[in-house]
Amino acid sequence: MGYDDRERDRERRRHRSRSRDRHRERSRDRRHHRNSRRKPSLYWDVPPPGFEHITPMQYKAMQASGQIPASVVPDTPQTAVPVVGSTITRQARRLYVGNIPFGVTEEEMMEFFNQQMHLVGLAQAAGSPVLACQINLDKNFAFLEFRSIDETTQAMAFDGINLKGQSLKIRRPHDYQPMPGITDTPAIKPAVVSSGVISTVVPDSPHKIFIGGLPNYLNDDQVKELLLSFGKLRAFNLVKDAATGLSKGYAFCEYVDLSITDQSIAGLNGMQLGDKKLIVQRASVGAKNAQNAANTTQSVMLQVPGLSNVVTSGPPTEVLCLLNMVTPDELRDEEEYEDILEDIKEECTKYGVVRSVEIPRPIEGVEVPGCGKVFVEFNSVLDCQKAQQALTGRKFSDRVVVTSYFDPDKYHRREF
C-alpha cells in the first residue's frame, strides 16, 4: 500500500470519527432539549415584578392604552400580594373616604380598615392591606392607599360602614381610570352584608327602587327607618342638593332579600306623608311586573307626629300587620316576648275584639317568615280600621309604627 492510499484511509477514519462525534453531540442536544421542555419557561409570559396578579393579555392591554410604558418594568419587591408600581397604578390603589368622624387619626383609619378587611375575608394575604392614609381635616375626608388593586376594589364594599357613629362614603378618586381587563366592581360577600353595612351607592339593577315624593325635611335615618320596616337594606341613597345639603325629595334603595322588592313597593307606593304622596316603583325602565306592583291594592298608611293623618285607598281586611315595632333580638328573650305580646293585645282591644295575635319569633339557623312583624286579627273589618287609624304613626319602643292590612287567608295559613 502506497503513501497516498494510507493517507486516504486515515482521512476516512478521521471523517467517520468526526461524524460520530457530531452525532453524539446532536443526540445530547436532543436529550437536553427534551429534558428542558419539562421545566417551566423562565422567559415566556413571566409578569414583571408588581404585576403578578394580572394575565399577560391584561398587561398588554394596559400597555396599549398607555397605562404602562412599553419599556418600563417597575423595580418593586415581590410579596405575597404584590405592591404594584407606585406611579403607574397608584390611582387604582387609592380610595376616597368621606364623612369621616371629627378628630379621627390616620392611624385609627388604617387600623379600622385593616381589621375590617381581615374580619370579612377581603384581605388576600397576611399583613396590612392598607399601606397609607392621608386626612384632610378641613374638608372632612381622607384618602386610603392599598397594597393591591384587587383589595382596593373589594374595599369599596365597605361604603356606608359605620365608624364612631359616622356612615363613611367610599368612592374612587376623581383621577381614577379603570384598567382594561380588571374588574371594577367589588364582590359583595355575605360577611359584609351580615355586618350591617348599607352602601350609599345603589347600582343599576332590576331590583333598584325609586322613592319619590319625600318631604324635604326628612333626613337619611328617618327615610331608612321607614324602608327598614320591610327588611334589611343592601344600599340606600337619599339624593341631596350639592350646594345646600338638603334632601331633593327622592331616594333610591335595594334590599338584601330581593324578594322584598315587590312587597315594599306595594306597601309604600301611594302612602301619604303630610301633603305629599309617595311614588315608589322600580327604578329600571320597563322592569317586569313594575306596573303590577305599583297598581297593587294593598293599603298602607303612615302618620308621623306633627303631620296630618290621611288614610290611603284600598280594601281593608280584619287582619292588621304592624311593622317597625319589634326586633328579632327583643323576641328571643322569653320574658320580653311575653311583655310585648301583652302590651299589644291590651292596646288593640281598645279598638275592638281581638281574635288572635301572631308575632313570629326567630329560630336559630332557620329563616322565619315575617320575623319582626306583628299580626293582629280583629273580629270585624270595622274594628281593624279603627285600630289602624289609631296605631299608625304611634311610637313603640321609640320606633314609628307602620301599618298595613293583611290577607286573612295568608294569615290563617301562616304565610307571613
From Swiss-Prot:
Domain RRM: 93-175, 207-285, 318-408
Region (Disordered): 1-47
Record's keyword terms, sorted: mRNA processing, mRNA splicing, Nucleus, Repeat, RNA-binding
Localization of this protein: Nucleus
Biased composition (Basic and acidic residues): 1-10
The keyword RNA-binding belongs to this UniProt entry's keyword annotation: yes
Gene that specifies this protein: U2af50
Family matches, as InterPro entries: Nucleotide-bd_a/b_plait_sf, RBD_domain_sf, RRM_dom, U2AF_lg
GO cellular component: commitment complex; nuclear speck; nucleoplasm; nucleus; precatalytic spliceosome; spliceosomal complex; U2-type prespliceosome; U2AF complex
PANTHER family assigned: RNA-BINDING PROTEIN (PTHR23139)
Chief location: nucleus
Protein name: Splicing factor U2AF 50 kDa subunit
Subunit note: Forms a heterodimer with the U2AF small subunit.
UniProt-listed GO biological process terms: mRNA splicing, via spliceosome; nuclear export; positive regulation of RNA export from nucleus; regulation of alternative mRNA splicing, via spliceosome; RNA splicing; spliceosomal complex assembly
Spans traversing the lipid bilayer: none
UniProt xrefs under PROSITE patterns: RRM
SUPFAM superfamilies, alphabetized: RNA-binding domain, RBD
Family: Belongs to the splicing factor SR family.
Any one GO molecular function term: mRNA binding
Keyword Repeat annotated: yes
Stated role: Necessary for the splicing of pre-mRNA. Binds to the polypyrimidine tract of introns early during spliceosome assembly.
Basic residues bias (residue ranges): 11-21, 29-40
Organism: Drosophila melanogaster
